[in-house]
Amino acid sequence: MPVRKAVVTWTGARDGAGEVRLGSATQGLRYTWASRFEEEVGSNPEELLAGALASCFAMALASRLTRNNAPPKTLTATAEATVEKVEGEWTITGVALHLRGDVPGMSLAELTPHAEAAKAGCPVSRALKAVPITLVVEE
């Protein structure tokens, strides 16, 4: 099985900056305390986690639908990770997944159980079992 890698270099104290280099990317992503907990431009770990969940979920759902003879035309998954202080420590308290899907011949009511199953079974969701993940399937 493949092993995926990310390398992080942090320079300086809390007001320093870091760079995340993903194994397959040609450029790193800059992140800082302010891009994480304030409104500064830059990436942050929660955004990367949300992206990992949304992409894993979309791939799992596309695979599931294809196996059920309903290949999707497009799936757009959005994930929003919420980070809050819990007992004085920053904690990811939930992730909200939103799905818009164009699946020819499939209604929203028919798509929703497939989306729920993909959410429960994708590897990133399984790794995040301690975090509540909600799913809204939209028209």
Walk through the language-model features, giving the residues of each.
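Extended beta-strand/beta-hairpin segments
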Residues: 1-51, 58-139
